A protein has these predicted regions:
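Conserved beta-strand positions that form and line the central face of beta-propeller blades
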Residues: 44, 79, 105-108
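Bacterial N-terminal signal peptides that target proteins for export
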Residues: 2-9
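Electrostatic cytochrome c docking/interface patches
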Residues: 27-58, 129, 134
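Hydrophobic h-region of N-terminal signal peptides that target proteins for export
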Residues: 13-20
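The canonical Cys-X-X-Cys-His
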Residues: 55, 59-69, 120-124
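Gly/Gly-Pro-rich "capping" loops immediately C-terminal to redox-active cysteine motifs
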Residues: 52-56, 68, 72-98
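Boundary at the C-terminal end of the N-terminal hydrophobic targeting segment
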Residues: 20-22, 38
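C-terminal capping alpha-helices of c-type cytochrome domains
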Residues: 109-134
Length: 134
């Protein structure tokens, strides 16, 4: 009887582990690059940390259904707290928010006012500390 329970438990744990690995967020797309001029653009709100609150509200409304409230990614959406994301310039993140990447499920937010997109970038910078790179 104990062997059957152990076997059943092992099978259940294996299925859970396999399912969990299939649900990992995508790695950032290294071919989705902002043009140099866009990447070099500084965040005009960088010295106004109080505006991050607006970015947090926008993130909850527009982004959390895919990236989660903490930005760690749900399903195939990338972890926005990761080193690979956080190492990108503010201008690059702004460009990606603006243009999107429909091949990867990221919509364009070009219709969102520019300052609100910059607030989102500022909020991304306030997410939990990024994981260390390789």
């Amino acid at each position: 009887m104990r062997k059957k329970i152990k076997l059943a438990l092992a099978i259940v744990m294996s299925v859970v582990a396999l399912w969990g690995s299939a649900q990992r967020p995508r790695q950032p797309d290294l071919h989705w690059q902002a043009p140099a001029q866009a990447a070099a653009q500084p965040n005009p709100l960088a010295n106004q940390p109080q505006t991050e609150v607006g970015g947090r509200k926008l993130f909850r409304r527009l982004c959390s259904s895919c990236h989660g409230l903490a930005g760690a990614g749900i399903g195939q959406a990338p972890n926005l707290r990761s080193f690979d994301t956080q190492v990108q310039t503010d201008g690059t993140l702004f460009w990606k928010i603006t243009n999107g990447n429909l091949d990867r499920g990221m919509p364009s937010f070009a219709d969102l006012p520019g300052l609100e997109r910059w607030q989102l970038v500022l909020h991304l910078r306030h997410l939990e500390e990024p994981a260390k790179g390789p």
